[in-house]
Design a protein with these regions (language model features):
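Acidic metal-coordinating catalytic centers involved in nucleic-acid phosphodiester chemistry
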Residues: 1-5
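Structured alpha/beta reader/binder surfaces that contact nucleic acids or chromatin modification marks
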Residues: 9-167, 171-173, 180-182, 189-218
Length: 218
């Protein structure tokens, strides 16, 4: 079940590349020829190895088809000139990574676009790819944050991840929850309303969540 999978997640390890698709032509070519490509300048040694690629379709280009539905296992990565990617011709000597994909697999659902999406590329892990329902959730950084979100989503459909790389937390209605300094802090319109230790939440998530929720009107 999900509990056994959750215990195995390495939250610092992000080996799923989320690649933004720039056109319907690119989507068709990448799917038909089982590959994805990205400028060498966008990846560093720290991003390697990449084990899977997930295709992100923006709302502006794909409308009702927006979100993430397809992902695939990376078989190999080649460094090539852009002009050598003949499936989508463009004359350029710029260097790209060509990621060859075993086959594109459907998640069986869409990971929905919410407040913010993916401009070029981003990274997540396989667990989040398989269990998240909205794109911002793919950037959750810890088990306790994932567990808190699952509890929160049972109470409200309004919850969203705070769009800030330096903050782990969620916004919903007039409230905000922030994970910092070893604590989970609840803020309302007039400042901090309550807090609990992250360690206490890990030991007793339901009880600690209920303790914070008593302050909220959802």
């Amino acid at each position: 079940g999900i509990e056994s999978k959750l215990k195995k997640v390495d939250w610092k390890h992000r080996d799923v590349l989320i690649g933004s698709v720039r056109s319907r032509e690119q989507m068709a070519a990448c799917q038909d020829h089982r590959f994805y490509y990205v400028p060498v300048s966008m990846l560093s040694v720290d991003n390697m190895p990449i084990h899977e690629v997930a295709l992100y379709q923006s709302r502006s280009l794909f409308g009702q088809e927006a979100g993430i539905e397809y992902y695939g296992e990376v078989l190999s990565i080649e460094k090539v000139k852009r002009s050598e990617i003949t499936e989508i011709p463009r004359y350029s000597d710029s260097l790209y990574y060509r990621l060859n994909i075993k086959g594109w697999v459907s998640l069986g659902r869409k990971i929905e676009v919410k407040e913010f999406g993916v401009q070029t590329i981003a990274f997540t892990n396989h667990f989040l790819l398989k269990h998240c329902t909205q794109v911002p959730e793919l950037f959750i950084k810890s088990e306790e944050a994932f567990r808190f979100l699952m509890e929160l989503k049972r109470k409200t459909s309004d919850a969203s991840l705070i769009n800030d790389d330096n903050i782990t937390g969620f916004e919903f209605g007039e409230y905000k929850v922030v994970f910092e300094d070893g604590e989970i802090k609840l803020f309302g319109e007039n400042g901090m309303m309550d807090h609990c230790r992250i360690n206490d939440f890990v030991r007793r998530p339901n009880a600690q969540f209920r303790g914070l929720m008593r302050h909220m009107i959802l």
